[in-house]
Amino acid sequence: MKIALSCPASLPATQFGGIMFLCLDIAKESSKLGHDVTIFTTDLDFANNPKTFNKKLPRIEKIQNFLINRSHVWFSIQLFFVNPGMYFQMNKQNFDVIHTIGIRSFQSLVAAFIAKKKKIPLVISDQGGLTTHPDLTSSLTKK
């Protein structure tokens, strides 16, 4: 089965946390079962802050038995990273299923558009909570 995974960050941005680790775990385990897996993500490098993007990271990188396909972020609004190149990368390929992780992201929107356009099943996994994110103000929960 050819599987596309979509998430806002991947290696080397390990500080990004849960979404990235969940995506990597799914990629590792699925590829061990013989599936053809590609992670579509940004070029977030994280280098001590969540706004460091690195155009020098390989656009396509093979790690273990899966691929990481990165595209450059044009701009970001807090942790909402806009990388339109991901749409074109995903649109060029055909997948049996698309799995997006972290639904409050540009990458999930792209995955949903591609799935709808190409009539590919879409799996959505959320990770984290809207009111627990450290970058959001506490005014969301104040009464």
What are these regions (language model features)?
Residues 1-55, 64, 120:
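N-terminal subdomain of nucleotide-sugar transferases
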Residues 8, 101, 126-129:
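Histidine-centered beta-alpha loop that forms part of the nucleotide-sugar donor binding/catalytic region
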Residues 40-42, 71, 125:
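Generic beta-sheet signal
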Residues 18, 51, 110-113, 137:
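Short amphipathic alpha-helical segments
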Residues 54-56, 60-100, 105-113, 117, ...:
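An amphipathic, basic-hydrophobic alpha-helix
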Residues 13, 47-49, 78, 107, ...:
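Generic structural signal for helix capping and beta-alpha/helix-loop junctions
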Residues 121-123, 130-143:
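Nucleotide-sugar donor phosphate/pyrophosphate-binding loop at the beta->alpha transition
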Residues 4, 97-99, 125:
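Structural motif
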